[in-house]
Amino acid sequence: MKLVAVTSCPTGIAHSQMAAENLLQAGERLGHDIDVEVQGAMGTQDELASDAIAEADAVIITSDTSVSRDRFDGKLVLKGTVKDGVNNAEAVVQKAVELAEAGKTGSVTFGSGDDGEDADVGADDSSDDADAAESDEPVRRGGDPEKGLFARLKKLFS
């Protein structure tokens, strides 16, 4: 089966790279052809070709940031967090294959994602997300913004 994936995190240095590597290894181990694009603070690496997207049976997005889905119209798109890609890559690939073989299209959120129809991949964090969704306060991800990559770069260049 042909799969494409996009990983992205706010800094794009470690976690998105680890998720990409784990998804590649899991796809190969399960006998599937998978291409992975990494989006981070420094731009996009291994950008998915339009041909690869057109041939794909499913799209996997493991991201803690916003990823444009326009180029994936008409495809099965599975959305989860970078944590899902790092910790549960094999289960994520298996879920994508299962849904694609069933002929599903559209968007499905899995794992520790926020609002999906299907949350059984890596569901150990689902109760935390349900509590966060019920409160009126926004969910904040990441560390202290004063200590992040952008803050350090700003200090370096000012």
From Swiss-Prot:
Modified positions (Phosphocysteine) in chain numbering: C9
Chief localisation class: cytoplasm
Annotated EC: 2.7.1.202
Reaction(s) this enzyme catalyzes, per UniProt: D-fructose(out) + N(pros)-phospho-L-histidyl-[protein] = D-fructose 1-phosphate(in) + L-histidyl-[protein]
Keyword Transport: yes
GO CC annotation terms, alphabetical: cytoplasm; plasma membrane
Active site as annotated: C9 (phosphocysteine intermediate)
Pfam families referenced in this protein's UniProt entry, alphabetically: PTS_IIB
Domain PTS EIIB type-2: 1-98
GO aspect biological process, one term: phosphoenolpyruvate-dependent sugar phosphotransferase system
GO molecular-function terms, A-Z: kinase activity; protein-N(PI)-phosphohistidine-fructose phosphotransferase system transporter activity; protein-phosphocysteine-sugar phosphotransferase activity
Induction field: Expression is highly up-regulated in presence of fructose.
Miscellaneous comment in the UniProt entry for this protein: PTS-type transport systems are very rare in archaea.
UniProt function note: The phosphoenolpyruvate-dependent sugar phosphotransferase system (sugar PTS), a major carbohydrate active transport system, catalyzes the phosphorylation of incoming sugar substrates concomitantly with their translocation across the cell membrane. The enzyme II PtfABC PTS system is involved in fructose transport.
Protein name in UniProt: PTS system fructose-specific EIIB component
Source taxonomy: Archaea, Methanobacteriati, Methanobacteriota, Stenosarchaea group, Halobacteria
